[in-house]
């Protein structure tokens, strides 16, 4: 059928209509011929027709590749009428087809000929034999999902979301105010958010809503109880940020551990240019090799950090906040033991009742004064006032934070009083946000929506899609 890509005329059309008539297996109503060439001339339809299980399934496959195909089919049914008419005339002249009138209705019948066998129109004939024109046209009507994507600035302006247009009618809002949410989502069937809070107050008028997708793993901003009561599915994304968060864990540590703020300032202030020695190590630093690295939460990210820390020669121990993780490669200890033995502690646990304010003044008092604390998990795992005091009092050597209990950071956060960047470094929740990580996140959400539309369900939280 590659010849169709170069030709769209009555000679080829007559061969297509002849094969269609053979597949139909009985006299073809004349008006039905107008529905043949528009589909066979369509590249995606031809590519799918032999593998599809039905005409509707073939349309769905085409729609999945390009939702605009429905409009293309409808337009072609009108535009190709002349080609169809000429093709039928040529088939009549060549005696491939003949036409007769029965009960005041004209129909076409195929005769023996040397016309090349074309499988695609033959299959279409087999399908149409069991369908009325009304049923054919019904297959060309697919109700599109109404997809609302909120706070797209949180995923990055460099991310291309145009692919989502394949899934439905998409409206994007870079930023939203809380009071706007009920109006923006009231007609949505699918809503995508990152950190926007969705609860009964702003969901109660979204009566068409079927799915909430998160550009995130955590879902504590979604009222799951309300969603369950109203049949709204919630889907998150998992594992997309593991490489990025693990990388940022070490970025925060190295910044502190090797006293990089001091040495960068030393050079740029001109002191190095005035020095008489080729080296200057006024602020002493150590190697990771041989040190004990304590991990709180040995999930995917915790395991990735453990692997890298081991490669640096560290001795890894871990505390499982859930009690579910048991990894024979590393020593499992209780929380107090981890605090007492660790030279570096990195937090990779979820926020829950067991981890809320886990690191308080009691915990800091048990840590080594030379220890560093890294938190790339959830801000509320640390009591920030207690951490600030521990840093000021020298209870620990330093802390690297990518998360805070309140985000954006509160203006009166006690950590802002610590100006020494060798003791404390804070980044604005960016550990997850490498270009590659955000690209994976966007793709994962796309797959979650696609799977839901297909009735399969993917990454559904709390209950399965039946």
What annotation goes with each model-predicted range?
Residues 78-93:
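Short amphipathic alpha-helical interaction segments
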Residues 89-103:
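A short, conserved structural fragment
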Residues 113-142:
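Glycine-rich, aromatic-bearing surface loops/beta-hairpins
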Residues 143-188:
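N-terminal glycine-/charge-rich "phosphate-binding" loop or analogous flexible N-terminal tail
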Residues 199-202, 321-414:
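Rossmann-like adenosine-cofactor binding region
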Residues 234, 370, 376-466:
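Rossmann-like dinucleotide-binding domain for NAD(H)/NADP(H)
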Residues 238-292:
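Phosphate-binding beta-alpha-beta segment of Rossmann-like dinucleotide-binding domains, i.e.
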Residues 301:
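Hydrophobic/small residue at the entry helix of a nucleotide-binding pocket
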């Amino acid at each position: 059928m590659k010849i169709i890509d170069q030709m769209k005329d009555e000679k080829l059309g007559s061969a297509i209509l002849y094969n269609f008539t053979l597949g139909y297996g009985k006299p073809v109503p004349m008006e039905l011929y107008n529905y043949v060439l528009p589909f066979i001339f369509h590249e995606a339809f031809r590519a799918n027709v032999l593998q599809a299980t039905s005409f509707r399934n073939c349309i769905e496959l085409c729609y999945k590749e390009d939702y605009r195909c429905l409009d293309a089919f409808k337009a072609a049914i009108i535009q190709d009428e002349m080609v169809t008419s000429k093709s039928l005339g040529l088939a009549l002249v060549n005696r491939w087809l003949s036409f007769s009138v029965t009960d005041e209705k004209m129909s076409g019948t195929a005769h023996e000929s040397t016309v090349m066998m074309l499988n695609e129109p033959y299959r279409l004939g087999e399908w149409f034999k069991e369908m009325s024109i009304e049923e054919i046209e019904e297959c060309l009507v697919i109700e599109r999902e109404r997809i609302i994507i909120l706070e797209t600035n949180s995923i990055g302006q460099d991310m291309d979301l145009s692919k989502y247009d394949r899934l439905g009618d998409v409206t994007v809002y870079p930023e939203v105010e809380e009071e706007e949410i009920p109006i923006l989502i009231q007609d949505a069937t699918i809503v995508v958010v990152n950190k926007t809070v969705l609860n009964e107050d702003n969901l109660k008028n979204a009566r068409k809503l079927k799915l909430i997708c998160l550009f995130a793993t955590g879902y504590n901003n979604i009222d799951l109880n309300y969603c369950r009561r109203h049949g709204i599915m919630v889907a998150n994304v998992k594992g997309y940020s593991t490489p990025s968060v693990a990388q940022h864990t070490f970025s925060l540590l190295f910044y502190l551990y090797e006293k990089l703020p001091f040495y960068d300032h030393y050079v740029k202030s001109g002191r190095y240019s005035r020095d008489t020695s080729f080296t200057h190590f006024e602020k002493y630093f150590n190697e990771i090799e041989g040190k004990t690295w304590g991990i709180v939460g040995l999930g995917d990210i915790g395991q990735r950090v453990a692997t890298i820390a081991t490669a640096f020669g560290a001795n890894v121990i871990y505390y499982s906040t859930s009690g579910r993780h048991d990894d024979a490669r590393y020593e499992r200890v209780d929380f107090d033991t981890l605090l007492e033995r660790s030279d570096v502690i990195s937090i990779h646990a979820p926020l829950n009742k067991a981890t809320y304010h886990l690191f308080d003044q009691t915990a800091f008092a048990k840590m080594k004064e030379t220890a560093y604390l890294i938190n790339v998990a959830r801000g509320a795992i640390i009591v920030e006032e207690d951490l600030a005091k521990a840093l000021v009092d020298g209870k620990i050597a330093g802390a690297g934070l990518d998360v805070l209990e309140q985000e954006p950071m509160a203006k009166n956060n006690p950590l802002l009083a610590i100006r020494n960047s060798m003791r404390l470094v804070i980044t604005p929740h960016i550990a997850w946000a490498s270009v590659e990580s955000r690209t994976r996140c966007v793709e994962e959400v796309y797959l979650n929506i696609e799977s839901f539309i297909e009735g399969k369900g993917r990454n559904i939280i709390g209950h399965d899609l039946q």
